[in-house]
From Swiss-Prot:
GO terms for molecular function: ATP binding; ATP hydrolysis activity; ATP-dependent protein folding chaperone; unfolded protein binding. InterPro entries: ATPase_NBD, Heat_shock_70_CS, HscA_NBD, HSP70_C_sf, HSP70_peptide-bd_sf, Hsp_70_fam, ISC_FeS_clus_asmbl_HscA. It comes from the Bacteria. This is Chaperone protein HscA. GO terms for biological process: iron-sulfur cluster assembly. It comes from Buchnera aphidicola subsp. Acyrthosiphon pisum (strain Tuc7).
Amino acid sequence: MIFFKKKHDKKLLLGIDLGTTYSLAATVREKSVILLLDKKKRYLLPSVVHYKKNKISVGWKALENITEDPTNTISSVKRLLGRSINFVKKKFPILPYLIEKDIHEGIFFRTNFGNITPIDVSSHILKKLKKRAVLLFNQEIDASVITVPAYFNDFQKKETKKAAVLSGINLIRLLNEPTAAAVAYGLQKLKKGIVLVYDLGGGTFDVSILNLNKGIFEVLATSGDSNLGGDDFDDALAKNIYKKSNLQNRCNDFFQTSLLQIAKSTKLKLTKYEKVEVHFFDWKGYITREEFNLIIIDFIKKTLFICSDLLEEINLSVEQIKEVIMVGGSTRIPLVHTEVSKFFKKDLLKSINPDQVVAIGAAMHVDMLFSSKNNTKNKVILLDVMPLSLGIEVMGGFVEKIIFRNTSLPISKTKEFTTYKDNQTSILIHIVQGERELVKDCISLSRFVLRDIKPQKAGLVRILVTFQVDTDGLIHVKILENYSSKEKKIIIDNNITLKNLNISQILKDSLKHSKDDYYFRVKEEKKIECVRTLEILNKSLKKHLKLISKKELKKIKYTQEKLQKSIQEDDYFSMKNNLQKLDEVSKNFFSLQLKNAIDCSSIKNILKENI
């Protein structure tokens, strides 16, 4: 390993892949990407932290304690970042850690060192990478880009940022992992066309479709599953070994952790060999690659279903995909190669080590961010997208979308709303995220009240709602009430509501219920229109009853009753027809009311002129 004794003139800029199973960092020196190695020339750092009473060890050293002291050795923490206690217990029921609920429904680990959060664990991994960089280059880190899965929600991104702050690393941007991979390949080969990035890591699966053209990387669409990855292969293989071994009477933390480590080791060997001998306590047996393939095939099919749905969503065929980039350690598995290649009907792009490609892309990107503005030769523009639509709740419990899914980032959009009732002095603003029509089927991000609004008639108050989403996907909201200039600004902190987000499932539900949701919304909006019309008409009749004859009033009352009955029966077509009839029979009344208002206004003006 080379150490730089002199302080380097160039800024030290790091691209960091903070992974589920392994983490690594890279930097650009003399137009070449350098992977940061430890003293034993290893570029990978296991994402594992061991906590003793007065000592913390990270990486390979911590990994040695995973079977001996599983309760105090935290691994794959990325899967737990930003998750609630309920989610963790449901999804990972046999974790060996002592997990408890924090005050925000999140989690912390009880360790010999003390109470440790997933943010703390992530920060300790980042500190180790930071130390590696400082030792190697004999200078402090100036800036870094850290990669995250494309489907990390806002809260998970914020927790990643907090981990960077705790580690003392100057983070200037979060970058989607698939986008980083595209940067790594795109800058080398200057690709032009549509590229799909298939990223199967230890804890997450992400797929992104990008349009590459002369240095512009536009993310057309993204999807994935934040709870699908190589760890699931390990769990499934561990269950298979457990069943074969007939050791069901043994079940403690040490036993479970040992079983999982054997499963991981067996999986790695099966990427090279057709048959592997397994020793587990008193049991000895064999696992073949064919058997392993049967265990994991459903997981792989699930990733391909997600790819298929995404292609369908943006009206692309498999034939239109020019290249498929393979990212993530789990793509080393032969069956993954075979099935993905078969699905896309082409050879896969895998010339860059799938473990390294994300860190390489991140290093290239942070280097470009600090390049001279005049040096446009290898400039790249990254256009990421919004993973889910953003909107606010409107009358009837519906969602009015302001920024739609797969909109390029950064983005700022404003939409105007108004009041529903007379003399409102406050308005509840409910911000939601999702693809469904009803608020109850979407994710609640934030609720707050805009107060001290000047009382006015319904529809006269103008409320401007502005959503700004930055390049990291963080959401900034500004609410402005024009008349009284009341304003509120917030940055969304989804500390509870987004913790259990499974975007893949959200999109499936949206497609499944789209027809029913549409018809329900149309019917409910018609009902709201009917109720509002009846309210306005009743108020006008009380005030201007003398303007119409008894015969005309009788017609109006009769049609009102029919419309009221339609509302109670929840019949869309009946509501539509009776509302139309009510408009017809009350047209003359509203004309007389308008004429009367004009006449009264004219009289007032004449009186003013003659006073």
